From Swiss-Prot:
This is Derlin-1. It is a multi-pass membrane protein. It comes from Caenorhabditis elegans. One of its GO terms (biological process) is endocytosis. The keyword NAD does not apply. Signal peptide: none annotated. Residues 27-57, 122-166 are lumenal.
Length: 245
């Protein structure tokens, strides 16, 4: 598979997010961009009016010998779960998926500034993974050491592993909280009560028109999105799809 076909096989919103999140950190790693302009901090955004920082913090991650493997895992999660959501749950409705990312990004930015978290890539990716896991909660996933469990538990397993191995876990908790907020407001509540609490702005539909068969709004996403349980496993411990359970 050549590079062009690989990229064209990724839905449009995921494609641009994935490309930015791989290229920009590499440019920073090799000194082509000044990383001092990339991170998120309350004082710089609010008091010094550097309003670009929530955006640069979304696509930049400090790649070092110590963080490089973790960055690769985040890029893999982004590719796998963002692609799955956009091409399955939001199939033909990339504008609705973009609105989900904007919703999550807005709240991740606020929480991360409050908690002095300088980069948004990890909590944003975890928020997307959380939504996928809730929509596909009965899918069986395989984790390290042969562990298998329903997808609904995957975000918490990742949180536990990172808390133990890296001494952190705050990034994952922010992602879980934001992902749950979106899932409840945009998917679960409308599915149970038939009332849309939020809806995608029309300008996003004009920017990325729905494909044939796509519908505007969020109502019914869970009913229409749940797939038959499938298997996932983690290559070398971290994730590719299996053909079945």
């Amino acid at each position: 598979m050549d590079l062009e076909n690989f990229l064209l096989g990724i839905p449009i919103v995921t494609r641009y997010w994935f490309l930015a999140s791989t290229i920009i950190p590499l440019l920073g790693r090799f000194g082509f961009i000044n990383v001092q302009w990339m991170f998120l901090q309350w004082d710089l955004v609010v008091n010094k009016f550097q309003f670009w920082r929530p955006l640069t913090a979304l696509i930049y991650y400090p790649v070092t010998p110590q963080t490089g493997f973790h960055w690769l895992m985040m890029c893999y999660f982004l590719y796998n779960y963002s692609k799955a959501l956009e091409s399955e749950t939001y199939r033909g409705r990339s504008a609705d998926y973009l609105f989900m990312l904007i919703f999550n990004w807005f709240f991740c930015s606020g929480l991360c500034m409050a908690l002095d978290i300088y980069f948004l890539l990890e909590p944003m990716v975890i928020s997307v993974l959380y939504v996928w896991c809730q929509v596909n909660k009965d899918t069986i996933v395989s984790f390290w050491f042969g562990m298998r469990f329903p997808a609904r538990y995957l975000p918490w397993v990742l949180w536990g592993f990172n808390a133990v191995l890296r001494g952190g876990g705050t990034n994952e908790l922010v992602g879980i909280l934001v992902g749950h907020a979106y899932f409840f407001v945009a998917l679960k509540y409308p599915d149970e009560y038939g009332v849309d609490l939020i809806s995608t702005p029309e300008f996003l539909h004009r920017l990325i028109p729905d494909e044939d068969g796509g519908i505007h709004g969020q109502d019914g996403n869970i009913r229409g999105a749940r797939q038959q349980p499938r298997g996932h496993q983690w290559p070398g411990g971290v994730g590719a799809r299996l053909g079945g359970n």
